[in-house]
Amino acid sequence: GFINTAWTYVDEPGVYRGQCTELCGVYHGYMPIVVKAVSDSEYKDFIQGKRDLKAQQALLTEKLWETDELFAIGEEVYLKNCVACHQVNGAGIPPVFPALAGSEIVMNDKGRQVEILMEGVQGAAMQSYAEQLTEVEIAAVITYTRKAWGNDAGGDGEIVVPKEILDYKNNKL
């Protein structure tokens, strides 16, 4: 999977609608676009809010996390972001969306699983979540998939903590 970005300059704040004109996957050419343009001051407030959130997330990466806490957050993240492709039971929809239940990568290759969520999979439907999810959410959803559907019994049982995701982003993993 992949994400295309484009920039434009808008004179007046408001909501603008359009149509995706680049065919980057099945039905993407039919994707409607909605853009909310805001004033400079609103944009600066938005950016400051993102900076504050990033600082808060950095503090959360230093926290000592419990497995149950990560699992609960991960389940929420999974149900919002992953379930459409990988299904509630982790069975996926092979061959397009692989099963996570019983997956050798999910059960035993934590580093590869982190890489997949951070980078996506070239030539497959799996996109990168590095910009869509926080370090806490990525660590939690990986921990969830490593512990759900019996994966904890057959795998190495390792959890992922937010600090590992931050380190990956900083090329330290």
Enumerate the predicted regions with their spans:
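The canonical Cys-X-X-Cys-His
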Residues: 20-21, 74-88, 126, 141, ...
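Sequence/structural segment immediately N-terminal to covalent heme-attachment motifs in c-type
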Residues: 67-93, 101-119
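Extracytoplasmic/periplasmic beta-strand context in beta-sandwich domains
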Residues: 31-33, 98, 124, 163
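Short helix/strand-bridging catalytic loops that position acidic/His residues to coordinate divalent metals
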Residues: 3-7, 97-103
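Extracytoplasmic electron-transfer domains, predominantly the class I c-type cytochrome c fold
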Residues: 99-155
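A short secondary-structure junction motif
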Residues: 50-54, 81, 88-92, 120, ...
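Flexible coil segments in periplasmic/lumen-exposed cytochrome c-class electron-transfer proteins
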Residues: 50-69, 80, 131-173
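Non-transmembrane, membrane-proximal soluble domains of secreted or membrane proteins
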Residues: 1-72
